[in-house]
């Protein structure tokens, strides 16, 4: 207890010295932004910040995340390759420029340039963009894209006039959108400050100034909560829930998260992972029930699959390979590895709930079945760059897809990496299964909902049967709200902090 108190005192001293009176609402989150360019990163952390400064053509408001109008008042799929969006009139960017179809066309054309965008998956699906008038946009896609509209809440629209001649360095100082909040200041490692857009098309938000403080260290987030240095804190440490519940000034809010935590793998020829028996053995070696009980303190739900129930492609009845160390040893021996082999368990140490501890546990389980396991955990800023460079054979990572469609996830996570086509962008182990690739490509053109669900469920089943990955659990999102300001906060399924929704 004394050590905890000392740690909290140190953490309090580390908090930014910003007076709460200067800001109407302070939110502490567990991840910083990497850029103010809304297309530079597709991580939920970066998109969360961007959702305050920018709007998409559509939105997914809390609590249910149902696709709804935003900068587009209506939309329709005209045929298999054509989508029409009818834009909202009277909307202005923060600099006073009028929003119109030219901005939409410019945005999606800019997203095709890898210099500015990592959203190539959607951008490269577009063959052409027509703007017959200022408030109509017609997209022609290269092939049928069933989930095209489903992603339009996270493809944020930028102001053409102020963006076209600026690089990312300049853009980071003054992002220009139509969102509910105007950008004020980004002090890296400390805070992002924003001011209410009084002319917002949905009406001015409640809080006039908002500050989002990224704090990756659990103890420091807890200290902010204990010291009333924040109004809302996300990423509440599960190990400290009992202590937080005893704080009279704090209300805990939790909800099942859509994010699945899983172990990604390689199956490269010449490596042990190329043998499915090795992949099965590793799955049998991991005691997920113990991870949930002892590491997650019950704040997680075991899963056999990565997509969650609301996602098209989720399949009832899929079962994970049971924890069975003896079967694991037997499979390793059959594969020619009775004496084990060296294996590195990689992962971030500041991205997911107890990520480092989970990696440590997995390494321990693998050692128990005879593998020579070592740990390689590091800050997410380094780890994800390594994932993008396909440097790891076995790693912990998390995922959920805002499109609610396994097809898009499969293209990014399971398809053999093909950077030119935007395939396998987050397939960190470069897992490759030609049959799975074929199924993914074929499913991408299926528009009928029932037929598409059947095809995506087949992809899901194969990924589990071939042990393309080892799903562990769905996280539980836990937020803390400090009482006193009558803050009404409803967590979103995507974990975004959308300040306009806080009442």
What do these predicted ranges mean?
Residues 73-116, 132, 138, 221-224, ...:
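Aromatic- and charge-enriched surface segment that lines or borders ligand/interaction sites
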Residues 28-79, 109, 176-178:
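N-terminal lobe/hinge region of extracytoplasmic solute-binding protein
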Residues 31-47, 71, 97, 119, ...:
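A structural "hinge/loop" feature
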Residues 61-66, 153-205, 209, 326, ...:
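Gly/Pro-rich hinge or "lid" segments in bacterial periplasmic/extracellular proteins
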Residues 269, 302-334, 352-357:
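Structural transition elements
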Residues 23-26, 45, 187, 261, ...:
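Detector for C-terminal structural segments
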Residues 197-243, 372:
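Ligand-site clamp/hinge motif
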Residues 5, 76, 120-162:
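Surface-exposed binding/hinge segments that line
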């Amino acid at each position: 207890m004394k050590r905890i108190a000392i740690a909290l005192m140190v953490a309090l001293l580390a908090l930014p010295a910003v007076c709460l009176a200067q800001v109407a609402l302070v939110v502490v989150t567990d991840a910083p932004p990497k850029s103010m360019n809304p297309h530079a990163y597709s991580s939920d952390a970066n998109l969360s910040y961007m959702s305050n400064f920018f709007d998409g053509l559509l939105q997914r408001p809390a609590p249910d995340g149902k696709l709804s109008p935003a900068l587009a008042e209506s939309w329709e799929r005209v045929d298999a390759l054509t989508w029409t969006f009818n834009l909202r009139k009277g909307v202005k960017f923060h600099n006073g420029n009028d929003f119109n179809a030219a901005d939409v066309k410019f945005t999606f054309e800019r997203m095709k340039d890898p210099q500015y965008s990592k959203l190539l998956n959607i951008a490269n699906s577009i063959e052409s963009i027509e703007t017959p008038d200022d408030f109509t946009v017609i997209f022609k896609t290269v092939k049928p894209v069933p989930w095209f509209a489903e992603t339009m809440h996270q493809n944020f629209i930028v102001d053409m006039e102020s963006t076209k001649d600026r690089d990312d360095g300049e853009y980071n100082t003054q992002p220009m959108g139509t969102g509910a909040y105007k950008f004020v200041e980004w002090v890296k490692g400390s805070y992002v400050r924003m001011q209410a857009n009084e002319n917002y098309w949905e009406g001015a938000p409640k809080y006039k100034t908002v500050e989002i403080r990224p704090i990756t260290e659990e103890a420091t987030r807890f200290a902010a909560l204990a010291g009333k240095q924040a109004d809302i804190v996300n990423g509440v440490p599960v190990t400290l829930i009992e202590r937080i519940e005893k704080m009279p000034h704090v209300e805990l809010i939790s909800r099942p998260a859509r994010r699945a935590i899983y172990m990604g793998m390689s199956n490269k020829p010449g490596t042990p992972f190329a043998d499915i028996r090795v992949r099965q053995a590793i799955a049998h070696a991991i005691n997920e029930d113990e991870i949930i009980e002892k590491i997650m303190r019950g704040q997680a739900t075991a899963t056999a699959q990565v997509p969650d129930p609301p996602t098209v492609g989720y399949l009832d009845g899929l079962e994970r390979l049971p924890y069975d160390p003896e079967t694991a040893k037997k499979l390793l021996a059959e594969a020619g590895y009775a004496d084990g082999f060296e294996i590195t368990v990689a992962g971030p140490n500041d991205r997911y709930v107890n990520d480092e501890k989970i990696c440590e546990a997995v390494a321990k389980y693998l050692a128990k079945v005879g593998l020579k396991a070592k740990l390689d955990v590091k800050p997410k800023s380094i780890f994800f760059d390594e994932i993008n460079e396909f440097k790891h054979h076995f790693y912990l990572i998390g995922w959920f897809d805002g499109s609610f469609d396994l097809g898009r996830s499969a293209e990014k996570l399971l398809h053999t990496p093909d950077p030119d086509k935007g395939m396998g962008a987050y397939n960190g182990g470069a897992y490759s299964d030609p049959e799975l690739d074929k199924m993914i490509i074929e499913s991408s053109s299926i528009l009928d909902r029932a037929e598409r669900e059947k095809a995506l469920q087949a992809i899901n089943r194969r990924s589990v049967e071939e042990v393309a990955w080892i799903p562990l659990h769905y996280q539980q999102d836990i937020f803390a709200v400090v009482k006193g300001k009558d803050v009404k906060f409803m967590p979103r399924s995507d974990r975004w902090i959308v300040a306009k929704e806080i009442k």
